[in-house]
Amino acid sequence: MSEENKSVSTPCPPDKIIFDAERGEYICSETGEVLEDKIIDQGPEWRAFTPEEKEKRSRVGGPLNNTIHDRGLSTLIDWKDKDAMGRTLDPKRRLEALRWRKWQIRARIQSSIDRNLAQAMNELERIGNLLNLPKSVKDEAALIYRKAVEKGLVRGRSIESVVAAAIYAACRRMKLARTLDEIAQYTKANRKEVARCYRLLLRELDVSVPVSDPKDYVTRIANLLGLSGAVMKTAAEIIDKAKGSGLTAGKDPAGLAAAAIYIASLLHDERRTQKEIAQVAGVTEVTVRNRYKELTQELKISIPTQ
């Protein structure tokens, strides 16, 4: 039993009224009188200590999923072709289930917006899996795309380019190191078109993205190249010095990170070629070479000869 004040017409003092959750009754603790019964408990039948637990244990189904065109609110007919007992359906019932699925898909995707979102969310999931993006980034990208649809920004533009732009914006917002070239290579749209859509989203949706930090790219590039933690640390220190000297302003963060890693790999005798680093970083060899020259000259870094 837990104490809970209840405003009822009774001589029982309010602070003496308790609620019996098991029986659904309000009782006066002084007299034992049942003041009100048959109370329906509209709360959950479980306990949760965090918002995440509360969402997972909701009795009304799974949590909303922004990466599904209808946010996962509709039901789905399973594709396993098995009945409720787990037995495989016979050929006749299998054909019936196939027809039901077709009609269900038609019912779920009726309007042009539904069709647009369904195609876009499939594209988002495909690119997200290829880039190994976490769910939080895909959710953020889905929200950005939905806002673009609501404002009519997709009309007259390819779904692929807007989805790619939304993914890039989400990566920037979540401080996940992914370049525009890296995302664009997995779409039919070219980089120029994706960049144009990205600028449109920032302008029309008022999406705020933090300034990219070259250090955000260091860990990922170094891991892909199999470099040590010492190389990562030195590369980060080089970037910090470059910031202090004003060398990072207006420069591509991925290119700066690539050059810093190249310098650090030489200093620690874990040599990688400029071509190898450029490919992993998603920049050109020329960019790595130019940033390398700037950093070594301006910061007076001496590279040991082989």
From Swiss-Prot:
* Kinase listed as a keyword: no
Q: Where are the sequence repeats?
A: 122-205, 216-297
The UniProt record lists the keyword Thylakoid: no
The Gene Ontology CC terms held by the record are: transcription preinitiation complex
Annotated CDD domains: CYCLIN_TFIIB_archaea_like_rpt1, CYCLIN_TFIIB_archaea_like_rpt2
> What terms describe the molecular function in GO for this protein?
DNA-binding transcription factor activity; TBP-class protein binding
Gene Ontology BP term (one): transcription preinitiation complex assembly
Keyword terms = Repeat, Transcription, Transcription regulation
* Entries under SMART domains matching the protein: CYCLIN (SM00385)
Q: Which family does it belong to?
A: Belongs to the TFIIB family.
Q: Which NCBIfam families does the entry link to?
A: PRK00423.1
Function statement: Stabilizes TBP binding to an archaeal box-A promoter. Also responsible for recruiting RNA polymerase II to the pre-initiation complex (DNA-TBP-TFIIB).
Please name the PANTHER family in this protein's record: TRANSCRIPTION INITIATION FACTOR IIB, TRANSCRIPTION INITIATION FACTOR IIB-RELATED
What protein is this chain from?
A: Transcription initiation factor IIB
Organism of derivation: Saccharolobus shibatae (strain ATCC 51178 / DSM 5389 / JCM 8931 / NBRC 15437 / B12) (Sulfolobus shibatae)
- The UniProt gene name for this protein comes to tfb
